[in-house]
Design a protein with these regions (language model features):
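Residue-level signal for inorganic ion chemistry
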Residues: 33, 92, 135, 195, ...
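N-terminal Rossmann-like or analogous alpha/beta NTP/dinucleotide-binding catalytic cores
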Residues: 65-139, 143-161
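Short acidic-hydrophobic, aromatic-tinged amphipathic segments that line or gate anion-handling sites
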Residues: 4-14, 105
């Protein structure tokens, strides 16, 4: 069996013999929510039963991103992803042993893969390249050009080539099927608690701390500027948050995520003001967990007006933090 640490493989060309003959699960896995975790748990148990390795196969970009590459979707929150590639890697690596795959395989979703038929996908990728022994999929799994492949087709070819196929029923909460789109909608509509329940953890965004324009420092509220590897996010506004840092641990604060209309921001940015904290964190990789929505973004006529509002926002965030203790 391979080492328990997650190994990331970028492309089939980097797969070696030791990556073959395993158990695989396939999908977008955007958010790695409770439904995804059921699939990972099943994959892990099947790999243990067969005494082989487990592999999660996913795609970059996500197929829906590939098929909606025009500019009309770039500012649409409904088209935003829940997690970046780096966040997906980090989340999987942090999962407990019963959920964490041995390998994470990224396939580049391009014209070639988009045009591959379901049968070609099975024979060329699953059989010839990976020589899989078992595959775990969700009950709504579709694959191949025009999404013509389904569980029945996969099972038929499993019988032909000697691999087993298992389907996992959707995970439901209050009679609603947990899905990435449902979580995205909850976040857009300020239902953080509902989103967190479906994720099984607080919604979190990770990134490096960059040097910003330091406007916050001039009004008494220095901020950490988190580099976002995305043009859109399901969250917009001001939130109470917790910053997670390997060096500094957990630090409470308040965050604004959006386009900063007071300074005519052109792109989505995440800025975090940390309470009772004056350490330098430039260049660090941090994760920001969102707890409560404070308010929507708004444009202020002056920086004095912005400063007064931030003071009120901090008071509210601290009050929420105190109530949670």
């Amino acid at each position: 069996m391979p080492d328990q640490k997650l190994q990331v493989i970028r492309g089939l060309n980097n797969c070696r013999q030791q990556h073959q003959n395993g158990v695989i699960t396939i999908g977008n896995f955007d958010g790695l929510h409770l439904g995804h975790q059921k699939m990972l748990e099943k994959m892990h148990s099947e790999a243990s039963r067969l005494n082989t390795q487990s592999c999660l196969m996913t795609f970059e970009p996500l197929p829906r991103e590939y098929f909606s590459r025009d500019d009309s979707q770039k500012d649409n929150p409904d088209s935003s992803r829940l997690m970046s590639r780096i966040e997906k890697i980090r989340t999987l690596a942090d999962f407990e042993d019963s959920l964490r795959p041995d390998y994470l395989l990224f396939l580049k979703f391009d014209r070639s893969l988009a045009g591959m038929s379901a049968v070609e996908f099975i024979e060329q990728i699953l059989v010839e390249s990976l020589k899989i022994r078992a595959v775990i999929v969700g009950d709504d799994f579709r694959f191949g050009c025009d999404r013509k492949g389904d569980f029945d087709l996969l099972s038929d070819y499993g019988d032909k080539y000697g691999f087993s196929v298992s389907s996992i029923e959707s995970h439901c909460i209050d009679d609603h099927r947990v899905s990435s789109s449902l979580i995205r909608g909850a976040l857009i509509n300020d239902q953080l608690e509902r989103a967190d329940t479906m994720l099984g953890r607080p919604y979190t965004i990770c990134g490096h701390v960059n040097h910003g324009d330091k406007r916050g420092r001039t009004i008494g509220f220095p901020t950490a500027n988190i580099h976002l590897r995305r043009t859109q996010t399901p969250l917009h506004g001001v939130y109470s948050v917790t910053m997670h840092s390997l060096k500094h641990g957990d630090v409470a604060g308040i965050a604004n995520i959006g386009r900063r209309p007071t300074v005519d921001g052109a792109r989505v940015q995440l800025e975090v003001h940390l309470f009772d904290f004056d350490e330098s964190i430039y260049g660090e990789q941090v994760c920001i967990s969102f707890q409560h929505k404070i308010r929507d973004e708004k444009k202020f006529e002056s920086f004095d007006g912005l400063k007064q509002q931030i003071q009120l926002d901090c008071q509210k965030a601290l009050g929420l933090l105190k109530n949670e203790r």
